Amino acid sequence: MKNVLPPFIEIYRALIATPSISATEESLDQSNASLITLLAGWFSDLGFNVEVQPVPGTRNKFNMLASTGHGAGGLLLTGHTDTVPFDDGRWTRDPFTLTEHDNKLYGLGTADMKGFFAFILDALRDVDVTKLKKPLYILATADEETSMAGARYFSETTALRPDCAIIGEPTSLQPIRAHKGHISDVVRVLGQSGHSSDPARGVNAIELMHDAIGHIMQLRDSLKARYHYEAFTVPYPTLNLGHIHGGDASNRICACCELHMDIRPLPGMTLNDLNGLLNDALAPVSERWPGRLTVAELHPPIPGYECPPDHQLVEVVEKLLGTKTDVVNYCTEAPFMQTLCPTLVLGPGSINQAHQPDEYLETRFIKPTRELITQVVHHFCWH
């Protein structure tokens, strides 16, 4: 099978050269169809059965599932096909041209995380996938950088239940078994405009929001006091006020005010519980000013995630790498994969390069990543 696929670096180059930006702004958002076509062709060449799945609610985006083998269990290797937008003024290289310099591979998606598929393909090029004793699945998802729509849709619709999954996000090959979730909400206050010379004739939305923020700060303190997970560097749920806007003139009573905030819950905290806590915190303001305060989601929420520390996947990967699993504060698609099977986040490159100008992956990751993929496939699909 050695001659079926292009060389590793050419696969990498083709992936980086195929734009697949995800953005909430429609003018920047791109389909990942061309990238999915590339991947589907290569995995078909290796003998995989390939299914391309349109993702509802997206702008022409797709998941790809490549599968081989029969029966229950097996291994799922997964990652997302999209990247964030890039700031052209801050890049010193063409983001869509793979450039090797000073033991680094530069390009948009080299670390986060289109390059991971080049590693999978390269590791499998010498494997006769028809001889695996358990199934091997490769999932390429859409829209991770915005809504995680691809992972959500796959987890809600698939009947697959592998023994375990590995998501190849850039972790510097440090296995991650837990991370926090993310909830982003908008708090809106509707006041009543009027001339500032007669405050009694209006309802100042900024003043109501000031009251609401006081209660939100009390909730922040309560979350910090009540919930604790010492493995995290920030061992409690965080609550951040990120953006506020209200009013239009100094001599006008403010008619509306809007606050954007986020909460990063610990694993095990349910989204319903957090929504209830936020609504309870704001209840005094709502009762005092009926109909003037609302809370809504800015983005679909992401729950916290945790793989059981005593699971076989953790034991095997820790032994292969000679290192213990860790936890992180950022989010991945792991909560959705975890609904199917125990999941670890583990991949080449550094998270510090994600979403940065002149993104790169150090070439020192190439050999150990290829070896790791070969070893986990051998362990979970041949034993």
Swiss-Prot record:
Coiled coil: none annotated. Its cofactor is Zn(2+); Co(2+); glutathione. GO terms for molecular function: acetylornithine deacetylase activity; zinc ion binding. CDD domains: M20_ArgE. Its EC number is 3.5.1.16. It catalyses: N(2)-acetyl-L-ornithine + H2O = L-ornithine + acetate. Its main location: cytoplasm. Zn(2+) 1 binds at H80, D112, E169. It comes from the Bacteria. It holds the Pfam family Peptidase_M20. Catalyzes the hydrolysis of the amide bond of N(2)-acetylated L-amino acids. Cleaves the acetyl group from N-acetyl-L-ornithine to form L-ornithine, an intermediate in L-arginine biosynthesis pathway, and a branchpoint in the synthesis of polyamines. Homodimer. This is Acetylornithine deacetylase. It comes from Salmonella paratyphi A (strain AKU_12601). The lineage of its organism: Bacteria, Pseudomonadati, Pseudomonadota, Gammaproteobacteria, Enterobacterales. The gene is argE.
